[in-house]
Amino acid sequence: MGKRKEIKDNDVEMGGTDPRVDGDESDEDMDIVNVDFEWFDPQPIDFHGLKILLRQLFDSDAQIFDMSALSDMILAQPLLGSTVKVDGNESDPYAFLTVLNLQEHKDKPVIKDLISYLQRKASSNPDLAPLSQLLSQTPVPPIGLILTERLINMPAEVVPPMYTMLMEEIAWAIQDKEPYKFSHYLIVSKNYEEVQSKLDMEDSRPQKKKKKSGDKVEKFYFHPEDEILEKHTRCFGSIEYTHKHDEGHSDSKRAFQELGIRTNGSLMLFDADKLEGAINEMKEFLQPPV
């Protein structure tokens, strides 16, 4: 498989408010730092950084999986996938994206655990029935499991180049007869919903009127690109984590807001020929304003 060239993107705006959101344009709102981002192939030096990002991706359920083994699998295919760094090749990755062939690695313990976990979670959400059916097959189909995560303050604009390079690398791998001809892609992500603060509930002050039990809970995205990607999926849905956070966890993420947040997993299944169109729309959505 041909080696991808290292690329560099200058002056990406990092931090502050999203420039696409209407609002006051005061100096207080415009906290912008220009940062040079560099894209690299996964390397052994990234091992611990990848583990940290993988734990962040799987949240409270990260303890279920052997994250060291999963990191090693990512590093074992160095010409597929990317990391994003800001302080040169020797620094820790601030973001990563890769794909793993579930069929090719089905006998490896960490992939067995992942397939079993994803199948159970998909079967618990009717919206994910097509995914549950695929993961129940023996052997599992050639599904490309896309894993991607970034530090919380990383701009979404670093994501499209990673997907673009991944699609190129997969095409090169297929030309070289490597096992990356996928029938589907499955992206693991996260979202969150707002919940009533436990601290406020214990307070004696009058409370805001609660939503009726039948009201639909609004979903928010940690990764804004997920809102675009979902439109191109065969199916998508949220999953509850097996290991629950303690009751005070949502308040610890409240940050001066009236409501806390509860995180959920998110699964997005694509027919293989639909992902490229999703990536193209995502690029347009995340294109920095002129």
From Swiss-Prot:
InterPro entries: BCP1_family (IPR025602). Keywords: Cytoplasm, Nucleus, Protein transport, Transport. Residues 1-27 are annotated as: Disordered. Its main location: cytoplasm. Transmembrane segments: none annotated. It is found in: Cytoplasm; Nucleus. GO terms for biological process: protein transport. Residues 1-11 have a biased composition (Basic and acidic residues). It holds the Pfam family BCCIP. One of its GO terms (cellular component) is nucleus. Belongs to the BCP1 family. Involved in nuclear export, actin cytoskeleton organization and vesicular transport. This is Protein bcp1. It comes from Aspergillus oryzae (strain ATCC 42149 / RIB 40). The lineage of its organism: Eukaryota, Fungi, Dikarya, Ascomycota, Pezizomycotina. The gene is bcp1.
